[in-house]
Amino acid sequence: LDPAMRGWMNDTKSYIPPVEINGVMRAGSVGKVIQNNNNPNFQVGDCVSSWGGVQQYCVSDGEGCFKVDEKAASMPTFLSVLGMPGMTAYFGILEVGKIKEGDTVLVSAAAGAVGSIVGQIAKIKGCKVVGIAGGKEKCDYVINELGFDGCVDYKNESIKRGIKRECPDGIDVYFDNVGGEILDAALVFLRMGARIVVCGAISQYNEMSAKGPDNYLSLLVNR
């Protein structure tokens, strides 16, 4: 399951059409070819990744299907670090965020599928990495298992106070997965020339009306 599924249920203008009522829920999938009607690109038994949806079997003309090597990694891996979450994290933080050694990187939803990978990539690149997560268990995971330098527990402390503690010199890159009040808090600590990677807004997915940033001026003065 992916948070994006919630957005795909809304009949609004987006980067992809909504899922039809009574239709198969859109989802990335990994499976094996059990029958092939003369498609030269695949053979019975091939392991493939595709947008097969939430179902046990699907029929495809082969478009959007890609072979994966199940000997190289377990099949679920092609839905995580070697799938959409991994690609989102990789290109988001490197191509959009343009991180460099010494940057301070703040990641919301740091214990999630994308955020957890973003932070590890940033650490490999020599950045100081701080996460934002909800609850002690998630924050411990972010620091002790993923190797982040620090974590703000938005459920049990002031978000702004936590960011100030962990990022006393400000933020060079903010990887935003949630929007809302956490985005508002992060904007206060942007350094001059900071970059924001807008990946998700999960805090807003169930809201009837969208709420914009309260401190938009921070984007102007720290451009």
Identify the residue ranges that each predicted region occupies.
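Short, well-ordered loop/turn sites that connect or cap secondary structure elements
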Residues: 41-43, 99, 190
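Loop/turn positions that initiate beta-strands
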Residues: 45-46, 102, 193
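Short, glycine/polar-rich helix-capping loops at beta-to-alpha or helix-loop-helix junctions
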Residues: 55-56, 134-142, 159, 210-216
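Glycine-rich phosphate-binding loop and adjacent beta-alpha segment
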Residues: 181-223
